[in-house]
């Protein structure tokens, strides 16, 4: 099978979560030398398709298409067709009824890609009837670094988006005991965050993908946790996928202090080699003291990231397609 286009909904969606998806789509489009296909929801009666999801397929393209799907059973997107290869970004289905919905939603697709190794292994273990393969998440090649890359740091820690409660509490305690620490934190504002430094200076909303990455690039240390760690997100049904923020920290030259369970996804991304894993405040304090005054090993980072740029995922997909 040969992909002829990449499905995108960038004309309808916004926000940094979809911004990174659009970056992946751009790399797939460029390297496969195929156009982007803009999903046209303007002519669709969403209420009707929510009631009868199978109808959406009649309005979807008939050309061989690759599509990223944010949530596999959340909306009637019409991707259940023999010409569409969907890749599930977030897969949280565990209950029997959810799994049956998932199977039914994609039973016509010749191949269904699962981004989480943990979720993929789970589906294999329960004998998922679909033809599934693992296609990991990535970081766009536009951010590629090499051993000559120089990072100019301004803050010890920059906290972007939702935070792990334990890491947040540890940093609060650390800042009370170490008054020289510099950090950036966010306050919820509308659907996003407004950011401030440790002195209370307003840094703005970082509303674009570029703003987000540029601010992260100023941080020496990133605090990272998988989504369900410490009771963080309950909607993941216990799945603890490694999210792209981990790769964003690395490509922006940040040390990573992390909390995560050991599973096949954290093993795939080698978090044990690429982060300082902590359990207690004492471990956190020791890691902060050490990493605040230490540069990252850019050569080590660049070698690791070569395995996780989006171009690598394009090659994996191409290999899968040769088997169809």
Briefly describe each language-model feature range.
Residues 22-28, 32, 209-213, 217-321:
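Catalytic binding pocket for nucleotide-activated donors in carbohydrate/polymer assembly enzymes
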Residues 146-158, 194-202, 288-297:
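Short, surface-exposed amphipathic charged segments that create phosphate/polyanion-binding patches used
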Residues 42-46, 94, 140-144, 188-194, ...:
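A short acidic, often aromatic-flanked loop/helix-cap motif at beta-alpha or helix-coil junctions
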Residues 76-190, 309-312:
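Catalytic core of nucleotide-activated saccharide and alditol-phosphate transferases
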Residues 1-126, 259-263, 314, 323-324:
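N-terminal pre-catalytic "stem/leader" segment of glycosyltransferase-like enzymes
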Residues 141, 202-206, 237-238:
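Short gly/ser/thr-rich secondary-structure transition/capping motifs
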